[in-house]
Regions:
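Short beta-strand/turn micro-motifs composed of small residues
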Residues: 8-10, 35-37, 103
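N-proximal low-complexity "stem/linker" segments adjacent to membrane-targeting elements
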Residues: 1-20
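Active-site-proximal specificity loops/subdomain of glycosyltransferases
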Residues: 38-95
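A structural signal for isolated positions on well-ordered beta-strands in alpha/beta enzyme cores
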Residues: 5-7, 32-34, 50
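GT-A fold catalytic core of metal-dependent nucleotide-sugar glycosyltransferases
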Residues: 83-128
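Conserved catalytic core of nucleotide-sugar-dependent glycosyltransferases
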Residues: 109-165
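A short acidic (Asp/Glu
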Residues: 18-19, 44-46, 111-116
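Short, acidic, metal-binding catalytic loop of nucleotide-sugar glycosyltransferases
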Residues: 22-32
Length: 165
């Protein structure tokens, strides 16, 4: 299977159901998970879940270094608007992966390989359009796709500089 890393930022206390999420990650050993969180409690992380403890302010500052304009990222929920840019924003962590994606921590996964097949991974650059589970091919072109104009000049700039979601 192609190498996949799911990016999961979560700031605040992780929900009580998080252990179930971790169990479902463990049942998918071919997928890695990158958890960015300020919750430093010792939890039963499987080998394929890589927890990076950091503050929301530190993540915001890191994202800001990638742009020449000031970002509006005042609360963690706004990170949802940045999801299509994770390939660009976290390129060091995602180096070596064929695909990266994002998902919600309230998801319980079955065998992802049954649904996301090698054939799909070889044919598509993006799988899933909803925030609860999306995959993107890890290439420079796809990782910068969020900057492509869609009827207005630099729509990402408007989204990244307003507090609205």
């Amino acid at each position: 299977m192609k190498k996949i890393c799911m990016v999961v930022p979560y700031f605040g206390k992780l929900p009580q159901s998080f252990n179930f999420f971790l169990l479902s990650c463990a049942y998918n050993p071919d997928v890695d998970w990158l958890l960015l969180t300020d919750d430093d409690r010792p939890l039963p992380y499987p080998e394929n879940v890589h927890c990076v403890v950091m503050s929301f302010d530190a993540l915001r500052a890191r994202f800001q270094t990638k742009f020449s304009f000031p970002l509006s990222l005042e609360r963690p929920y706004k990170l949802r608007d940045y999801r299509p840019a994770y390939g660009f924003l976290l390129e060091e962590e995602l180096r070596g992966y064929d695909f990266w994606g994002c998902c919600d921590v309230d998801m319980m996964f079955g065998d992802i390989g049954v649904f996301i097949t090698e054939d799909m991974l070889s044919r598509y650059d993006q799988i899933g359009r909803m925030g609860h589970f999306s995959l993107y091919r890890n290439t420079p072109e796809i990782n910068l796709l969020f900057t492509a104009a869609a009827g207005e000049e630099e729509p990402y700039r408007r989204i990244f500089t307003t507090e609205e979601n």
